Amino acid sequence: MMSDLHIGETINRSLVHKYVAMANEQKADMAVLVGDIMDYESRIAVNQKVEEELRQIHAPLGTYIVLGNHEYRANINAKHKWLLQTGGTLLIDSVAMPDSTFYLVGRDDLVNKKRKPLHSLTKDLDPDLPVIVLDHQPLAFNEMVMNKADLGLHGHTHNGQFWPYPLIMKLIFECPYGYYKKGDTQFYVSSGIGCAGPPYRVGTVSELVVLHITFR
């Protein structure tokens, strides 16, 4: 799981190459990119052909991508077109079955006020199969619990990125970072692998998340 790459002025092709190498070392069954793949514009990703690096992610069940709020900042259509060239499956309010044992629901970002309610995406799914939801911003926990999602994967917060912002994140988000459980739904909010703005962190860490998931 990677979120918040923020490919742009500071997160360039050489860094993405390192991220992909790290991901491949994990030998994961599935890869998910949980929003804010790009920073403010698509120019650098396009000019440096960063999609060629992302196409090197090796995961037998595939790579799945959802949008973040930064995908809605400038050049929206160009960003969507570029994401389709990365070799991953772009899920925008849609459902995939990486194999026959579970569903993967990819939500549009909350920035889009017309995004579909979760119920409309899950109402026709087999209730006996687990449901994993990819949703960039960790702000719809109650909706996920009500709709009996099993696992939610999120990014967006960077866990504040700079001290003392982690304290502020705790005031804004029910869970700004890490593992959380509410009702029968489990969540993981990543601090992100990249950086927004200045290319450094103070008091927080960048992360590539490896999850071991067992269905009962």
Regions found by a protein language model. Name each.
Residues 1-216:
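Soluble catalytic domains of enzymes that build or remodel membrane lipids, polysaccharides, and related
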